[in-house]
Amino acid sequence: MDFAVPLLLDAGEHLLIDIFGNGERERAYDFLITAWSRGTGQYGYANHWVACIEEQIVGIISSWHDKLPGQFDRDTLTSITDFYGLDEAIDVVMRSQTYTIALNPPLVLELAIGHLAVAAGARRNGIATSLVRFKERMAREMGKLSVVLDVHTGNKRAIDFYQAIGFKPRQEIPPFMQMTKGVAPLG
């Protein structure tokens, strides 16, 4: 948790601080620690995969698809209401909705990836590429034909990275661009 949660926050710092911290980084970080520890829901450890070097977490990624169980959303909402209380949780959900309308859920034959981050000292070593390739294999095993992601349009470094590994822009709904990459089915 000492290394995973900071990476989770790094994966979407501006967005997560706005939604979960209402502009306060520490508040967002505290929520993510609590949500990660629960295990379940969108920010729980059970929905993330990590890359390690010598038992130290240096990378993180998450994924979701069109057939998530209803419990997934309930677990996410429970982690929010347990941390913030009901009144403040409503505000958190409302802030989240301002972003959610610009994000596209994956279609039936797509696997969406997100929360991708690599520790500063481990970058440019192929870790992010390896994490994405791992998810591409997972997509194939699930019978999906493409991997999709939403990236903030201001994150030029991430956009360049995704394009370098074969992702193409599909559509843009500010402040996000959805990118997609086809994956060959298992033969």
Name what the model sees in each region.
Residues M1-P6, E13-D18, D66:
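A short beta-loop-alpha structural element at the N-terminal edge
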Residues G12-W36, T81-L86:
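Conserved GNAT-fold acetyl-CoA-binding loop/helix
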Residues R25-H48, I53-E54, I101-A102:
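Active-site rim helix/loop that mediates acceptor-substrate recognition in acyltransferases
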Residues V50, Q56-H65, A112, A117:
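Conserved beta-strand in the GNAT
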Residues K67-E110:
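Conserved acyl-donor/pantetheine-binding loop and adjacent beta-alpha core of acyl/acetyltransferases
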Residues K67-L68, D150, Q163, K168-T180:
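Conserved catalytic-core motifs of GNAT/GCN5-like acyltransferases
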Residues L109-L111, A139-H152:
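Conserved GNAT acetyl-CoA-binding A-motif
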Residues H115, R124-M138, D160-A164:
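Conserved acetyl-CoA-binding loop-helix of GNAT-fold acetyltransferases
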